[in-house]
Amino acid sequence: MVELFLKGLIIHLIADWFLQSDWMSANKTSLLHPAAWVHSGIHTLGYLVIFNPAIAITVGISHLLIDTRKPLIWWRQIFQQSPKGNVAVVFEIWQDQAVHIVILAIASLIS
């Protein structure tokens, strides 16, 4: 399980930090934009290497939805977490990464 999680984390970091273009980064928050689908497709393809197809596709779709920022905005509203200024950007980036990593941990546990 730990080995599977570490492989998933490496795939995630490569797809999110090295393979994500400026085009994807700027447009992935809209489900109507192809960049969102291309970005999550890259993640899904990577996850297909280590997870069974159902789990890989589920993790890929979760990545797509998390990157719209709507679940993160909902979380901040429910728990009244609304940092301001430059801290808000950093908080959003790391909140996004934390949620993706939790999803990978769950996927690794059930695989």
Stretches found by the model and what they are:
Residues 1-4, 48-56, 111:
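Transmembrane helix interruption/hinge and helix-loop junction motifs
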Residues 8-43, 64-109:
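Interhelical loop and helix-boundary elements at the membrane-water interface
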Residues 32, 55-59:
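Alpha-helical transmembrane segments and their helix-entry boundary regions
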